[in-house]
Amino acid sequence: MNIFPILPGVDIAIHRQPEWQTSIKEAWSGVETTIAQRPWPRWRFSLQFEILRASVGEVAALAAFFNAQRGSFGTFLFQDPEYNSVSNQRFGMGDGNATLFQLNRAINTWLEPVWAVADTPVIMKDGVVLKQQMDYVVGTTGQVQFTAAPAAGSVLSWTGRYFIPVRFSDDKLDFERIFSGLWKTGKIEFVSKVYPT
């Protein structure tokens, strides 16, 4: 997957918004029943570029990236400037049988899956670094497959950087020429992909 280009002229204000989907049914008595439609929030992001320089190809790079995704059709990777790495993040506990575990991230006490790692993560069992390929492999959606089931009670953790798989919210992108060779964009919005667990 392609990585969203963060160019020098990006506005410092990047908005992020968790979005849930809840069905609410009300009985004739007024009693409500709520049903969560997904286990994880869908994240909405918005940003804009205050300055894009045509002379160094920034306008062309952003336009080409957007067109390569075919607007809201394609999935790409976004690295949130604040939430993009973990250190010694616990992602599971061995039970002696399971060999497949999903990497996760913590936002305070809230845990959610990491669907795309940015580089080779460091995987640890009880604080001891394991060897990739020999002890485990990491799949494209952040799942760790161990070659042997971690012993019951062993703590699994990881350190590394991650991306958020997203798609554009719209099929059009607005560029505005503000001066000769200088451009800016309107608000660019994208939404995270929610994968089955």
List the predicted regions and their residue ranges.
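Extended beta-strand solenoid/passenger and fiber regions
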Residues: A60-M134, G160-T197
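Secondary-structure transition/turn motif
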Residues: E50, N104-N108, Q145-A152, V194
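Exposed beta-strand and adjacent loop surfaces of beta-rich binding modules
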Residues: R44, A118-V122, G153-V155
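Solvent-exposed edge beta-strands and adjacent loop segments
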Residues: M1-Q69, I164-T185
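A surface-exposed beta-strand-loop module
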Residues: V129-S154
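A generic structural signal for beta-strand entry/edge sites
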Residues: R42-R44, A98-L100, G139-Q143
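Surface-exposed coil/turn segments at beta-strand junctions on protein surfaces, enriched
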Residues: W40, G96, G139, A149-A151, ...
